[in-house]
Amino acid sequence: MTSIKKKYTYYAFGLNILSELPLPELNCPAIPDDNIDIVIKTRDLANAEIQLDEEKGFTVYRNEVVFEVSNTALFSIRNGREIIVVPLEEFDKDRVRLYVLGTCMGVLLMQQHILPLHGSAVAVDGKAYTIVGNSGAGKSTLASAFINEGYKLISDDVIPVTFSDKNIPVIQPSYPQQKLWEESLNNFGMDARAYQPLFERETKYSIPVKNSFHNQPIPLGGIFELVKGSGESVGIRKIEGLEGFRILLHHTFRGSLLQKLGLREWHFIYSSNILREVHTFQVTRSTSKFTPYDLVSKILNTMKEGNLNA
């Protein structure tokens, strides 16, 4: 007897998604009458046709990237169109969703020649502004401060950057959820008990932001790299010259795969086209006190002064 798997349709990352795996975070339905862009399938190990050469890390073939989360699942991302999930003995759907919506989507976007930046993006006065930075820099916390000031989130974690017909960089919305550490929740006066902790991260939580989510593509207005400073100082400076390329390369989601995928030249050209249209800034935050609202004010002032359109 053949079992028929239930399928779910969603719209996220600028893509119509058909999935055999429920992804409740993606509560935006697929666009009616549009073609399905990507398919997420589950397969048992015997029928998956997956070859994993590297015990740790990624196995990269011409049109396929494979990796394993130990004892949980095998993942195969193929041709920018398909994600295969193979459950293993300790399969956990919550943990697997983190990888599907993170690493798998980041790789799939690169296979489609769409730049995935690692950070958060917010909508301000009809433009998208990305906040990129290393892990722990405070990207989601700064984005949350923007939300609390009445602005809307476009993406958190994986930021898809595409181009319009007029070659203007555009940010595609991901899905209405943030990930915040308990320390940030406390600083914002939010009760951690009201939110779901992320798998294996007991002090990091999933924060739904459906009412503060911008669900349409929006032109990119600027890029802000968030870094930790020394002491209480906060500041912002405009990035000049080749440093903009360094920022885009360093903060590409799973950028370590660019070489194996043969995409270094593509990435350079793509970055050139972005930097030709928008300015990049570095924002320094305090490490001794909670300053996201100060940073929001400085960033908004930079926008109003016209420095992003010079």
Explain the meaning of each model-derived region.
Residues 1-92, 96, 297-310:
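Long, basic/Gly/Ser/Thr-rich N-terminal segments
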Residues 2-22, 26-28, 125, 129-132, ...:
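Glycine-rich, often acidic-flanked micro-motifs
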Residues 97-115:
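N-terminal pre-Walker A segment at the start of P-loop NTPase domains
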Residues 112-126:
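Phosphate-binding P-loop
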Residues 136:
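Walker A (P-loop) phosphate-binding loop of P-loop NTPases
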Residues 139:
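Conserved lysine of the Walker
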Residues 142-143:
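Post-Walker A alpha-helix
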Residues 146:
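Aromatic pocket-lining residues of Rossmann-like dinucleotide-binding sites
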